Structures are given as structure tokens and as C-alpha cells.
Amino acid sequence: MNSPSTDQPFGDIERIFGYADAIDDSMPMQVVAPEMALMSCFTRQFCAALIRTAEACGGFDQHPDDPVPGHELSLAQISPRLFDSLQNDLGSRIWPQLQEQWQHIDYHGLNDAFIIKYQQGAQEELRLHHDVAQVSGSIKLNDDYTGAELEFPRQGFSNAPVPVGSLLVWPSLVTHPHRSAPITSGTKYSLTLWFELPLQLN
């Protein structure tokens, strides 16, 4: 279940605008497949608040210029303050862990962070592709659905066993093409992170 417990002192407003009750550091980074790492990131309560807030905002749209269109909603559209809080958190808490795996990466912030919604009759799957970023990440926001696994054919890995709130990361370009399998029941929500490419030097 994704609903916060009744004794939890934080509501959605505190979570979304104050980043309250967001951080989960219970699981250290572990390598789960070739050049892929997994670590805890968000609490279930924060994930559920993201879903409720995204649905309240609406606007899950496919962008016409996107070569791999999905029903997406950027966190920057929901709240620039939320986007900034996430960007700062990832830079200070998550990126140093990633540098243990990939020593020569530098943090240049987020290119985007967006929620993708999958359901039958709408966005049911996502074709095989790779991203245009330095590092990509995916956070499963709920698990009350079937199908829609994030699959990496070259690495022989899927996110089926990944817990809600955990962050799966991989190098974005060339080596890690991935897809979302068809959803078979329920509604899936996931948060995609694109870490910005290194800045061009003049």
C-alpha cells in the first residue's frame, strides 16, 4: 500500500514544498548488474505524495518532439521549489555515492526529473531506447500493478525486484538501452532522472 500511516505528522504540502519525510538512507549503494547501481532514496510516504500531487496537477502529456514519447509530468512543472530541493539533495547525498562507482563523473545538476504514468488504454509501454544524459536514474513510486518492468536487455536485468523508493542508476548513452514492458493491470508511476551532461569548456 502506498498511503502514509495515520500517525505520520507530515502531509503532502510539507512533503512537496518542504521536502519533509523524503529521504531514505537505509540501503547503501550496491551493484546489481554491469555498470548499474541501486540504493535507497525516497520513503514510501514521499513517493505516494508525489503520485497524489502529480494527479492533482494533471497534465501527463506526450511531447510531440520527443522521439520516445511518454505520458510525462516534470517535477519543475509541479513545483520549481521541489525540483531545486531534489537537485540539491541528489548532488549532496547521491552523487558522492555514484562517484565511488564512476570516479570521473562531475555533478552539473539535473537536466530533468519527470514522472511517467503507465496504464492500459493510454501509455502502456515504452520502446527500447537510450537517454541523452550523463547518468540516468529511475525510482519506482508504487508497486500495485503488474507488468511494466523496466528492462535492460544487454545487462539481463529488470527492475521487477527493486523496492519502491529505491534509485536505480546507469550510464545514459550507448551501453544501456532499456524499455518498459507492457503494463497488464493497475497504474504504474515512476520518476525518471536525467543528470546533466558535463558543461562544454570554452
Give the ranges of each region predicted by the language model.
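N-terminal accessory regions of S-adenosyl-L-methionine
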Residues: 1-22
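Short charge-dense sequence patches
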Residues: 1-7, 34-49, 86-89, 115-120, ...
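Short linear sequence motifs
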Residues: 3, 10-12, 35, 76, ...
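Proline-rich intrinsically disordered, low-complexity coils
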Residues: 4, 9, 28, 34, ...
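Non-heme Fe(II)/2-oxoglutarate
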Residues: 15-107
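Catalytic core of non-heme Fe(II) oxygenases with the double-stranded beta-helix
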Residues: 92-202
